[in-house]
A protein has these predicted regions:
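N-terminal nicking endonuclease/strand-transfer module with a His-rich metal-binding environment
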Residues: 1-175, 180, 184
Length: 184
């Protein structure tokens, strides 16, 4: 079974999310791992996709949208949401979960739960501190880019409109969807 974690961020540095996703990090020090020349080291294996943006220009796309709608200007505003879906390490062997399949599940999850948002979806194979559990990171701009049809979990009429902020809905909805992730 998968576990869902949510982190809200007030940082306006959207590029930091991409850097964390594609480069190796020292989890204890919370810093990038550098080679002997001082360059960041790419992760050994990851899958990366963007929704409503190109993944490698996520930061610029989010900043542009924020300027367009004049949102996310206050330092105390939540500017992005980071969701992590962690699979049990046994899912790799018992359910034949692969990085590719986890990425597909992450994309499905992001499209269903964060429609209209710019998002990065990235699967890591290594797990926290080398635990080996496959996990998917979903980082969304808190500002919705596109109008979308109203979903049953959207609590306010504006929750489906472009230019409005992500409203963290009842986690009951997200957790219900989390348990419905079909591995095979």
């Amino acid at each position: 079974m998968a576990i869902l974690k949510h982190i809200a961020s007030k940082s306006s540095n959207y590029g930091a999310a991409l850097e964390y996703l594609i480069f190796k990090h020292d989890e204890l020090r919370k810093t990038p791992i550098l080679d002997q020349n001082g360059n960041r080291i790419m992760r050994d294996e990851f899958y990366l996709d963007g929704l409503n943006c190109e993944p490698y220009s996520f930061d610029a796309a989010c900043q542009q949208l924020n300027r367009e709608y004049q949102k996310n200007k206050n330092k105390n505003e939540i500017k992005s949401h980071h969701y992590i879906i962690s699979f049990d390490p046994r899912d790799s062997t018992e359910n034949c979960l692969t990085g590719k399949r986890a990425q597909e599940l992450g994309l499905e999850y992001a499209k269903a739960n964060f429609p209209g948002h710019q998002a990065l979806v990235c699967t890591h194979m290594d797990g926290h501190n080398g635990s080996g559990n496959i996990h998917v990171h979903i980082v969304i701009n808190s500002l919705r880019k596109l109008d979308v049809p109203k979903q049953s979990f959207m609590e306010r009429p504006i929750d489906c409109k472009a230019g409005h902020k992500h409203h963290p809905v009842s986690y009951t909805h997200l957790r219900a969807h989390e348990t419905s992730l079909h591995l095979v």
